Each structure stands twice: as C-alpha cells, then as structure tokens.
Amino acid sequence: MKPKILVSRKISDGAEEILKKEFDVTLNLEDKPYTYEELIKLVNEYDGLISTSFDKLDKNFFDNLKGKLKIIGHVGVGYDNIHTQSAKEKNIKVSNTPNVLNDAVAEITILLILASSRRVGEAYNLVKSNTWKDHRPDITKLMVGNEITGKTLGIIGMGRIGQIVADRARAFKMKIVYYNRNKLSNDLEKDATYYPDLKSMLPNCDYVSLHTPATSETKNIINSEILKLFPKHSVFINTSRGSTVDDNALIEALQNKKIYGAGLDVFNNEPNLDKRYLELENCFVLPHVGSATHETRLAMSMLAVDNIKCFFSQKPLLSEVV
C-alpha cells in the first residue's frame, strides 16, 4: 500500500506528477486554502504532509494529531510557522527547501535597493494615475532619487543569500560591509569588511539589507534603538522575515524621515501587513515574492517531494529540520 500524502496548496506540476506516480496523494489543484480546523481534521488521515508558509502548524496542531502523520515536507526555507519542538516530541520529521531560492531572493533584494533609491513606486503611481502631465518638469525635484553606484551596502547575516547579494552589488561597484555571527573565510569574504558589532557597522551604511532567519534572537532585531544608528540618507531592505522588524519603530522612522526609505518583501502577520506601510511614499513594498520565479518554485516543490521520497525509502532527508 502506498503512503498517503496530503498537499496543502498547489505546487509545481512536475512535482505533482511525481507524487501521483509514487504515492496515494491528495492534491489541491484549485489552490483553495484549508482552514486551520479543516487541515487538522484532514491530516490525521495521512502519512505525510507537504505544507507551505500559509499553513499554521502550531503546538495545538500537533496536540491534535492522532499518530498517523510521520513527515512534513515544507515548501520554503523559513519554517517559523511550524512548532518544530512539538514535531520532534511527536517523532514527526520536518524538512524545508533551502539553497534552491538563493539567486531569486538575491535578485529581489537588488530590485528593492534600486526601487527604493530611485523612487520607482512613486514614479509608477505617477504614470498609472495619469497625473504625470500635471507636474511641472522641475529637473531638480520631480522623481529625483539616489544612485547606488559606489555606495556602501551593509549586510546583516552573511549566509548564502547574503553572499550572493554582495556579489550582485559589486556589479554596481558597491562597497560591502557585513555583520555576522562569525567572520567569513577570506575566499568567501572577498573584499567585504567584517563588523563583529552591528551597532558599529550601521553608521557607515548607505543601505542595510537583512538576511537572517526568524529566531528568538533575531525577533525585532530592527528596533527603535537600532534605527537611531542608521544615517538619515540610508535605506533599509528586508527579504528575510517580518518578525525581524519592530513595525512601529520602522514606520515611525519612515514617517519622520529619520531614514530615506525602505524596501520590504516580508512582513509581520502576512498577508495582513500593517496598513501604515501602504501610506508611506518612501516605502516600496512587495507581497513576499522573493522566491516567485518559475525556476525557483519548481525547484522548491521538487525538493519537498524528494524529501518525502527519501523518508519513505528509509534514506536520510536532503534538508532535515528536525
């Protein structure tokens, strides 16, 4: 008898085809989200679950499991929506999909740097609202932003994505400085300058890009105390996790022009982000699309499926969390 697998949302066609061949699978072809209660009730009938960040797999979720579920193949790098300690206590394996989305997230990071610097959101709205013609063409003011060439980019979290962002930024002749738990080896560091203390790095940055996982240590790492150290002309970029930012502190800094701008792809309480962000002209926002390329989403789906296959073949998981 084939193991039963539940897929909570629509994933890439190629991955779904493999699941249909090798497992007794229930797909979500219409991509209609299950309610929290529906998912708890349904998953008790399955041996494996392929989940996404939209699924709330908290302690209560695991407390209501009846012993059949053996593995969760999560489609995504971050897994802060999964109570991994409860999974471990229930002897349920959890995997994620790291590394396959590094390039895509790095690209979005550079996009946010450029969009925030060159006021792309404001310029786009000017054209779409058909009000461009109503503005006097003052070449010193109309949609004038900042160049990024030759500026200093500070990277918080110099892991794989942070390193790729640094490589992309070097094409703009940007100077790279970084704060990380540990100093990188010379071959990985390249020409970047290491700061063992975040507070000493920030005053030297024109741009600050955050690339840390969501942990208790990184929760609200961007707060009012830290934002005071940003230069007034600086831009903050976040493509990591919304929980790393104190929304009130960042919004206050943007409202009062304490920093030049922000480019954000992630938020607290997604998709119900703080509406004040939408009122800020100096904040360029995206709906968490860092990994949203055909190539990356296929790779993420395939890795999640490969982890499921490994588990039921009694092989080590390719990217085990717990």
Whereabouts are the PLM-identified features?
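An N-terminal-biased, well-structured beta-alpha scaffold segment characteristic
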Residues: M1-S95, N223, K228
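Glycine-rich, N-terminal phosphate-binding loop of Rossmann-like dinucleotide-binding domains
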Residues: R9, T52-S53, G76, L210-T212, ...
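N-terminal Rossmann-fold cofactor-binding loop
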Residues: R9, Y178-N182
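Short, Asp-centered acidic motifs that coordinate Mg2+ and/or phosphate
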Residues: D47-G48, I71, Y207, V235, ...
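Rossmann-like adenosine-cofactor binding region
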Residues: L57-N60, R181-R276
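Rossmann-like dinucleotide-binding domain for NAD(H)/NADP(H)
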Residues: K90, V94, S224, H233-V322
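Phosphate-binding beta-alpha-beta segment of Rossmann-like dinucleotide-binding domains, i.e.
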Residues: P98-T152, I164-D167
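Glycine-rich Rossmann-fold phosphate-binding loop(s) that bind the pyrophosphate
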Residues: M158-G159
